[in-house]
Every structure is written in structure tokens, then in C-alpha cells.
């Protein structure tokens, strides 16, 4: 799978409706589900794994959790679905994640992460990857990050999505954790030099991605989050700029029509409302868009 351009997993953002919209704009960008905790699948709604469309590939299922057995069970279940990759979230900084000891909190427990990753790989034929931060709280982002990457890679993991910031779990909100900890792109680039056999995709604060593409050329890809959600029209030129194939070149009116045709297939009124919310960004920056 070519990870040159990826759209980050975002809670309440990257659901199947937004991903359907994105596929009107780019065929090749790698899409992620929202993070789904293993318990919500095993003890809640098992249909969560079925919330995608065949047109979405390439698509990555992102899981949250810290129990090898639970993760292995969900990986077994995911074998019945057409996901291209399964990603373990080790970067989410929310208080709920911290109290549950998953997400970024697991960066302080590499031995648990190792057991989880071994279990996932033993129970899936799909690529298993991780999404991490540079560290958490007072972690040293030099030696401790290298040690963490090495320990995870020893399990056979080859694909790392790296948010180029620390996560401050005790003092900052998730929103502040996306903005206040300083970006350190140089540290991510050094990871690639130190671990050339690993696939390193950079994430965090990348807004002008067409012009920043050259800045990250030594890495294996870039991952965009809020910018892609807020201004999805910019995604129309991803395929030509990052993959060397023709863009879809759909007009705004065609995209809008396709989305409303899709909405008509939805049986749940709440699903339609969610889908309409995701469309707001299509019109950002256009004259009279707020009308």
C-alpha cells in the first residue's frame, strides 16, 4: 500500500460518511476509520467493523486497547472485512484514554505494547501498524523514543505513523495537545535515518501539504488531519501530486449531487445529519458560503 498521503483518524470526523466524501475527491489517499476501542466491538456494537464501503480502499482500521487477547479477537473478526491494514493507536492524549491506559499512555509501557502487537500479528493476515507521538510528558524524545521504536520493531512492526509532537497527558486537553507542544519535524526525519528499514509517515501541523511535500521527501509519507477535514476541496489534486495519476476533476456541483444521492440510500436520519455536517468544509472559503 502506498502511504504517500494519508488522512488521519479523527474522532467524530472520519466516519464512513466523511470517507465517502473524500473518495469523491481522491482515489489513492489512505483513509483511516475513527479509533474504535476493542471493548466497543466485543461487548457493544459488532457492526462497527462493517461501517465502510468497498470504494474506500485503501483503508486502515484503527483500534484502541491494551489487552492482547481482546485485540487478537478483533483482528480475527476483521479478517472477514476488506481492511488493508490494522493500526494500534498509541498517540491519543484524551483524559479518557489516559484513565483507561491506552492510546498515548501506552508509550510508557512498551512491554504491554509488544505483547499487543505480537497478538495482533499472530491473528491477522493484514499489515499491523502503530500511530505514536514523540513521547509523553517528560519523556526524553531522543534516547527513549529510539528505544521505544526499536522494541516495537522487534515484534515485526514496520509501519509507524508519527505525530511530531509530545503528548502532555496531565495538563493539556486533546485540542491543546494538537497545538501547544512544539512540532519537531527534525526528530521524525532522524527516526528515518536511524531506522531506514521502517516506513515512517509524518503527522502534525501540515497544512500547506502541496508545498511541504518536498520538505518531507526523505520520509515515506505525510498524514493530514484537521486541514483535510476543514478544507476537503484541496484533496482534489492529491492523486496527481502524490501518486502521478489523473485527478477525478469532479465539479463541486457533481460532488454535492453524488453526496445527496448517497444520503438517499441511508435509512437512519441521524446518519444523514452526520453526513451533512461533514459537507460544510466543502464550501469553506467560497464567496457567500455561510449563506
Residue ranges of model-derived segments:
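N-terminal small/glycine-rich loop or linker at the start of catalytic domains
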Residues: 1-3, 39-58, 92, 100, ...
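Conserved, mostly hydrophobic/aromatic
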Residues: 7, 22, 34, 61, ...
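Glycine-rich, positively charged N-terminal anion/phosphate-binding segment
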Residues: 10-81
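Alpha/beta enzyme core
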Residues: 24, 72-86, 90-100, 111-198
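Short, Asp-centered acidic motifs that coordinate Mg2+ and/or phosphate
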Residues: 29-30, 85, 159, 221
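Alpha/beta catalytic cores of nucleotide-metabolism and tRNA/nucleoside-modifying enzymes
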Residues: 1, 5-6, 11, 17, ...
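Active-site beta-loop-alpha junctions enriched in small/polar residues
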Residues: 10-12, 36-38, 64-66, 91-93, ...
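Short, hinge-like loop/turn segments at secondary-structure boundaries
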Residues: 48-52, 104-106, 146-147, 178-180, ...
